[in-house]
Amino acid sequence: MYLLVNFIVALAVLQVQAGSSYIPDSDRNTRTLQNDLQVERDGKYRYAYETSNGISASQEGLGGVAVQGGSSYTSPEGEVISVNYVADEFGYHPVGAHIPQVPDYILRSLEYIRTHPYQIKDYYTGELKTVEHDAAAFNVYTRNIQDHTIPQSRPSTTPKTIYLTHPPTTTSRPLRQRRALPTH
């Protein structure tokens, strides 16, 4: 049994090693055509590389602050995929023909939302208030303690008793005493 387990483990290890060494025929003889790297003392850097199978990339910037660059490769379908990007304090902004664009109906709805602000009726005053589309929407519900506005109507806060099963028994004797003792 021990020999069988060792054999299965060895076979699994060989299978993993054989699977990880596979290189497509188109990439077996790939050579690096260009490989440049420049790093300066102030943190600025620039690198670029290109391979014989059509993969290329370049990037430059100031480490941890802002970078810009791009890369390209040929897809299995033969289409050249190219991405250019900028990454800075405003985020990562990729540009490429293969990246989906925001549909027109979404852009139109965002414009409509921007030009037609949301209005909320104040619970206490009944006044309609325009709300900006950010955290200010929650400020409508916060009230100043020094504001002595009296609510016009208030819902009843009187507690009601609700029995989930049966109402309590009216007898004051414990359950043991209420049971009749068995007679023999």
Curated annotation (Swiss-Prot):
Component of the cuticle of the pupa of fruit fly. GO terms for biological process: chitin-based cuticle development; imaginal disc fusion, thorax closure. Residues 42-103 form the Chitin-binding type R&R domain. It comes from the Eukaryota. The keyword Endoplasmic reticulum does not apply. One of its GO terms (molecular function) is structural constituent of chitin-based larval cuticle. InterPro entries: CHIT_BIND_RR_consensus, Cuticle_Struct_Prot, Insect_cuticle. Residues 147-160 have a biased composition (Polar residues). This is Pupal cuticle protein. Residues 1-15 form the signal peptide. The keyword Ion transport does not apply. GO terms for cellular component: chitin-based extracellular matrix. Keywords: Cuticle, Signal. Pfam families: Chitin_bind_4. The lineage of its organism: Eukaryota, Metazoa, Ecdysozoa, Arthropoda, Hexapoda. Residues 175-184 have a biased composition (Basic residues). Residues 147-184 are annotated as: Disordered.
